[in-house]
Amino acid sequence: LCKARMFSDTLSKIHFWGWQLIIVAAAVTLPLGLTQGAEYAELIWPIDLAITIIWVVFGWNMFGTIIKRREKHLYVAIWFYIATFVTVAVLHIVRSGQLPYSFLHSYSWYSGVQDALVQWWYGHNAVAFFLTTPYLGLMYYFMPKAANRPVYSYRLSIIHFWALIFLYIWAGPHHLLYTAL
């Protein structure tokens, strides 16, 4: 997409090994019952902090690569990857806002109805923007290459991108239908 090597091999290694440590930490703490008790946001605050740091490393490397690219055209696919980084960062920071009271425990910034709304805004969009937008970006690059044809309509792909960004992110409350809220 960028016709350039990754911005930094060191950042790539930190990103890779950081995720491995996060996975191991989650695999150890979750069975021990050390959780926040929120679906899709179970991990305790030190692991959430590590996720934030590793996500910033990922973004730094991605944006560095985009900046040093040799391809003049910025493919729509890259827009979807940028949206993934920005949206997941905002989602994670807002949902994982905690007030630590010990090394392993914390209080959420939210309670009651606000907690439920923030939880499902996060739960819905963490899946949507962590899984769906990178896949769409991949398809916007791969399908035209595989078909050996350009994207049917660049304008339509731009409309698709902005519609996804401005409309899909607010769909989380449907997880609360038929609940006490």
Language-model features: locations:
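Membrane-embedded translocation segments of transport machinery
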Residues: T132, P150-L181
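Juxtamembrane/interfacial segments at transmembrane-helix boundaries in multi-pass membrane proteins
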Residues: E71-I78, F85-Y122, P134-Y135, M139-M143
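Membrane-interface helix-loop-helix modules in multi-pass inner-membrane proteins
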Residues: L1-H73, S96, P100-S108, Y168-L181
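Transmembrane alpha-helical segments in integral membrane proteins
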Residues: L1-C2, F58-G64, T133-A147
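Short aromatic-rich membrane-water interface segments that cap or initiate transmembrane helices
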Residues: Y40-L49, G112-A128
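Alpha-helical transmembrane spans of integral membrane proteins, capturing the lipid-embedded, hydrophobic core
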Residues: W19-I23, Y81-F85, A89, N125, ...
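Membrane-interfacial loop-to-transmembrane alpha-helix junctions, especially the N-terminal start
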Residues: A4-Q20, H73-I82, N148-L164
